[in-house]
Amino acid sequence: MKEKKLGNTDIIIPAIGQGCMGIGGDFTADNSADTEQIRALELGIDLGMTLIDTSELYANGHSEELVGIVSKGRRDQLFIATKFAPENNSYEGIIKSAERSLKNLNTDYIDLYQVHWPNPSIPIAETMLAMEKLVDDGKVRYIGLSNFSAKEMIDAQNVLKSKYIVSNQVEYNLFDRFIEQSILPYCESVNSTVIAYSPLDKGRAVEGEKRIKLLNNIAVAHNSTPAQVAIN
């Protein structure tokens, strides 16, 4: 597994992690596939995908609960990231969300806590002060964002007194390259990691006769798979 540094930290994370949207259900809990999904997460860990990203929104917290089950006995081997719902972007809302996530994840700290979406109705200063408080209290190790524009990242960073935003999780794949306009250049300029979600466009990147033919030709030339080509 290729590895990379997380932002301006000394933390090394795998280049490919496990996204947990759909694990445990969609937006409500669904226990029917728990056993299979736990095995899938465990296999991913065995293959080196020790970064696991979830959210309190996924399956109404059940996704976090499954990650908590998987992490039992090997918490120190994992880098666990989670997020909170935008309606909870207030100071009090974030503190309460963090406590719920800690319980769901069966852990006493979250490696990377991310603001899932900006919420224009709640001042970013209030949001980031709560994030900084969680770091100061030892409940969160690093602060991240998700779905933030470059300007929104700047506004968020300017609020923080002594902490840094180490990442921004955004959609990025062969067919959605919007972040290359301003988000990616900004992240590179401040050494903040871009965590790409939907890197295969939910499977669509390797679907379709023309796409498959092109990716297959490149894959054969480089002894890779079409999916590896799409990600690289």
Go through the PLM ranges and name each one.
Residues 105-121:
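Active-site groove signature of glycoside hydrolases
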Residues 118, 122-232:
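Beta/alpha (TIM)-barrel catalytic core signal, keyed to glycine-rich beta->alpha loops juxtaposed to Asp/Glu
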Residues 6, 18, 52, 67, ...:
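Conserved, mostly hydrophobic/aromatic
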Residues 11-16, 48-51, 74-78, 107-111, ...:
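Short, well-ordered coil/turn segments that N-cap beta-strands
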Residues 8-10, 68-75, 99-106, 135, ...:
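Acidic (Asp/Glu)-rich catalytic clusters
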Residues 77-89, 112-116, 170-171:
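A short, structured active-site edge motif that brings together acidic residues
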Residues 1-78:
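N-terminal binding-site loop/beta-alpha segment at the start of enzyme catalytic domains
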Residues 30-44, 90-105, 153-154:
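Short, acidic/polar
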